[in-house]
């Protein structure tokens, strides 16, 4: 567990993205509003609109679902590309996230799906996050592809987004130089930015042509 869980990605993604040398970033800014701690772990759409403006060399795809989509309808999504309304199950979602170079999100269940399928993700954590992630580490032994950016002070998202912007600016530049960067290359760059050595562990993979492994 968790890589041994038998999850399968759909054979065909619910949308296709033209390949180019721009970094593809999936985003989510809020989890389930029925979760008691969601107000502390979630942010507003405006945070990610500012992030997209700070990294114009990247393309940002909204995987947001639920009430968070109302913000898109009220304020408009530009320059984000909203794809969260194109899939409704984990299989289709898994196929969709595999088209991204990485995802940047506040803590939601999608982090676990990214981890299972080896998709690089930067999980933005509030000061006292889900107990499973501890209080200090930038990585977790549960998933090779998950990295954490944590609040250094309670409620301070400004610092978190400044740091993730610097990571994405660096990644976008690397992607311009090397359009064929794979998940492992992306993850290595993220870990370098965090000052963490990349150490991949051997874990069993789902018996599917869409394996939960970094390639």
Which residues make up each language-model segment?
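Catalytic machinery of carbohydrate-active enzymes
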Residues: 1-190, 210
């Amino acid at each position: 567990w968790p890589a041994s869980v038998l999850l399968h990605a759909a054979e065909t993604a619910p949308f296709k993205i033209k390949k180019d040398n721009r970094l593809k970033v999936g985003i989510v800014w809020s989890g389930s509003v029925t979760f008691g701690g969601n107000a502390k772990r979630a942010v507003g759409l405006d945070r990610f609109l500012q992030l997209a403006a700070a990294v114009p060399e990247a393309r940002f795809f909204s995987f947001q679902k639920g009430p968070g989509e109302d913000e898109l309808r009220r304020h408009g999504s530009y320059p984000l590309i909203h794809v969260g309304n194109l899939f409704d199950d984990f299989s289709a979602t898994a196929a969709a996230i595999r088209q991204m170079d990485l995802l940047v999100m506040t803590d939601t269940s999608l982090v676990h799906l990214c981890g299972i399928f080896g998709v690089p993700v930067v999980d933005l954590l509030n000061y006292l996050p889900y107990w499973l992630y501890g209080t200090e580490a930038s990585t977790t032994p549960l998933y090779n592809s998950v990295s954490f950016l944590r609040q250094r002070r309670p409620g301070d998202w400004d610092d978190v987004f400044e740091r993730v912007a610097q990571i994405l600016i660096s990644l976008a530049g690397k992607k311009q130089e090397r359009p064929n960067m794979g998940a492992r290359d992306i993850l290595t760059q993220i870990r370098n930015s965090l000052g963490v050595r990349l150490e991949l562990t051997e874990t069993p993979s789902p018996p599917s042509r869409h394996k939960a492994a970094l390639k």
